């Protein structure tokens, strides 16, 4: 297994032809060109791997995600643009279906909005509680 320092520099990226840059290039684009309509349709239906629109992924972000997964010994990683997006994705993955979440009563306002407004749309009930109040704990 490669050393940690080696993984930090090389994991998740293989230089590609024609130029074979040692450092991953930064792809500053929002959209990608397709060789034909059929390929584009297949990629948008998620039947063929590839990049369609940078909000859902691009080669630069893919290198970062692959490198992070390798460094953490994981099978994959998801990069988000904000902490709020990371919180939402994590909780929604855990709270699929009609679930109930007990949350700390003193959260960031944006998180409170997420939990009370957005999560209600997904059928997730949220109760806010002060964890220092032991009378709220029922076994």
Predicted regions span which residues?
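Alpha-helix C-terminal capping segments
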Residues: 70-71, 89-97
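Short acidic loop-to-helix transition motifs that present clustered carboxylates
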Residues: 84-87, 130-135
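Conserved small/polar residues in nucleotide/adenosyl-binding loops
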Residues: 137-139
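N-terminal glycine-rich, Lys/His-bearing helix-loop that initiates the first secondary-structure elements
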Residues: 1-48
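Conserved PLP-anchoring active-site segment centered on the Schiff-base-forming lysine
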Residues: 93-111, 130
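Conserved N-terminal alpha-helix of the aminotransferase class I/II PLP-enzyme fold
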Residues: 31, 36-85, 110-117
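A glycine-rich helix N-cap at a beta->alpha junction
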Residues: 118, 122-129
């Amino acid at each position: 297994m490669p050393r940690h320092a080696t993984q930090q520099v090389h994991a998740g990226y293989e230089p590609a032809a024609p130029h074979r840059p040692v450092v991953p290039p930064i792809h500053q684009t929002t959209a990608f060109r397709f060789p034909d309509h059929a390929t584009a349709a297949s990629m948008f239906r998620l039947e063929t791997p590839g990049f369609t629109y940078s909000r859902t992924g691009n080669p630069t972000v893919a290198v970062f995600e692959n490198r992070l997964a390798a460094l953490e010994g994981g099978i994959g990683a998801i990069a988000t643009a904000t902490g709020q997006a990371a919180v939402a994705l994590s909780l929604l993955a855990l709270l699929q279906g009609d679930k109930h979440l007990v949350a700390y009563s003193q959260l960031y306002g944006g998180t409170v909005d997420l939990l009370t407004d957005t999560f209600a749309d997904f059928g997730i009930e949220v109760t806010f509680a002060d964890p220092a109040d032991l009378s709220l704990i029922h076994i």
